[in-house]
Amino acid sequence: MTVTDIATRTYNHGWRLDPIVRSLLDTDFYKLLMLQMIREFYPNEHVTFSVINRSRHVRLAEAIDEGELRAQLDHARSIRFSKNELIWLAGNTFYGKTQMFSPDFIDWLATFRLGEYELRKVDGQYELHFHGPWTHTTMWEIPALAILNELRSRQVTKGQGRFALDVLYARAKAKLWAKVERLRKLDDLWLSDFGTRRRHGFLWQRWCVEAAKEGLGPAFTGTSNVLLAMDNDLEAIGTNAHELPMVAAALADDDTALRRAPYRILDQWRHTYGGNLLVALPDAFGTQAFLRDAPEWVADWTGFRPDSLPPIAAGEEIIKWWKQKSRDPREKLLVFSDGMDVDSIEETYHHFAGRVRVSFGWGTNLTNDFVGCSPDGTVDLDPISIVCKVTSVNGRPAVKLSDNPEKATGEPSEIERYLRVFGSAGRVRAPVHV
C-alpha cells in the first residue's frame, strides 16, 4: 500500500506535480465492458456526450480556470494504455471469467486515444461537449467529470495553508473512518467503491479505497475504478449504464421500435456477457415501464441496479415483479448505488435482510464527503451533482426520463414524446444532491 501525505501533495498542486488523469484505466470498469460491446455492435454511430451541471448555483466557469481545464483535458488526450495495463486487462479474471476482453479488443485499445473536445463559457457555466464515434466519446465521461471535480477542489484548497490542509484531511479521514466502523457491524455486507466520477481527487479516492479495504475486509468487494483495482489487487466492479438504452432509443425509427429499444440492446449485452454481469438498469425511461414491457428472459437475469427511486421503494417494486414472474427474490440481486451513504446503506440492508441479496455501490459520499471538515467553515468543498450524458446520436436528440424528473435530460419536445411512449407511472420528483 502506498502511503501518501495528501495535505502536502495538495499544498504542492500549484507546482503541477499531479496530473488529474494518470492513466486511461483511471475510469469505471463498466466503460470498458460497454466499449467492447459498442465496438462490436455500434462501431459507426456518431454520439455526442455533454457535461451537465445540475447544481446550477455553483458557477463552474467562475470556480475553475479555463486555462487549467484545457491543460488537464489536453493531458488526458495525450495518454495511451501502457503495455503492462493491457497485459493485466488481457490476463486478469473478472467476475470469475478469464479473457473477459478479446485479443482483438486488446489490440485495438493499444492505439486508443481520447478524441477532441468542444469547450466554451456560457453564463457562468462551462459547455463541454465530446463529438465523434461512440467508441471514443464514451471514454470521455469519467475523466471529464473527474477533472472538473478535482479542479474545483484544488481551487478551494489552493489558498489554504499547510496547517489548515492538515486539519481538513484529518477531519475528512476521521469522518470516513467513523462510517467504516458503523458499516463493519453489518454481517455479510457487500459494498464497493463507485466514487470515481465525482471524487474530491485521485489521491483522496485512493486513500478512501485503501481505508475501506483495511476497515471492511471481505465486505469491501472491490472498486469501479480499474486503475485502483489493478494497483490494490481488488475486483473491478461494474455492469452497464444509461447510455446503452439512451443510444438505442435515439436510433429507433418509430414509436414501436422506441418501446423495444431498451430490450434490444440488453439482448446484445447478454450475448456479449453473462453470469453476474446480467444486472439491468431499469430506470432510463421509468422502472414501471421497463418492468411492464420486459421480455420473460429479463426475469432470469442476476438482478437489477435501481438508480433514481428511493432504494426501499425501488427494491420492493422489483421484488413484487419477480414474484409475479414466479422467480424467487432470495436468489436474485439488487445493487443500490444512487446517493448511498452510511444511513441509507444500514436502513436498506436491514429492510431487505433475508428477502433478497443486496450489494451497495458507495459513490460520492465515500470519495467526496468534506461537509463540515474545512477549518474556515467554507461549503465550497461540498459535492455537486454533475453528469456527462449522451445528448445526440447521429444528429438525433437523446433522452433520459429517469424515475426522478429532476434527473431527466433531453429536449422538452423529445421528453414529451418519450413520455407518450413509455408513460409517466411511478416517476417521483425529488431533490438531487449528488
Curated annotation (Swiss-Prot):
Q: Which SUPFAM superfamilies match?
A: Nicotinate/Quinolinate PRTase C-terminal domain-like, Nicotinate/Quinolinate PRTase N-terminal domain-like
Q: Which domain of life is it from?
A: Bacteria
Q: Which reaction does it catalyse?
A: nicotinate + 5-phospho-alpha-D-ribose 1-diphosphate + ATP + H2O = nicotinate beta-D-ribonucleotide + ADP + phosphate + diphosphate
What the entry lists under InterPro entries is as follows: N/Namide_PRibTrfase (IPR041525), NAPRTase_N (IPR040727), Nic_PRibTrfase (IPR006406), Nic_PRibTrfase-Fam (IPR007229), Nicotinate_pribotase-like_C (IPR036068)
**Entry's Gene Ontology molecular function annotations:** nicotinate phosphoribosyltransferase activity
Main EC class of this protein?
A: ligase
**Any one GO cellular component localisation term in the record:** cytosol
Keywords in alphabetical order, please: Ligase, Phosphoprotein, Pyridine nucleotide biosynthesis
Instruction: Fetch the Gene3D superfamilies from UniProt.
Output: nicotinate phosphoribosyltransferase
Give the record's PTM text: Transiently phosphorylated on a His residue during the reaction cycle. Phosphorylation strongly increases the affinity for substrates and increases the rate of nicotinate D-ribonucleotide production. Dephosphorylation regenerates the low-affinity form of the enzyme, leading to product release.
Biological role: Catalyzes the synthesis of beta-nicotinate D-ribonucleotide from nicotinate and 5-phospho-D-ribose 1-phosphate at the expense of ATP.
Q: What is this protein called?
A: Nicotinate phosphoribosyltransferase
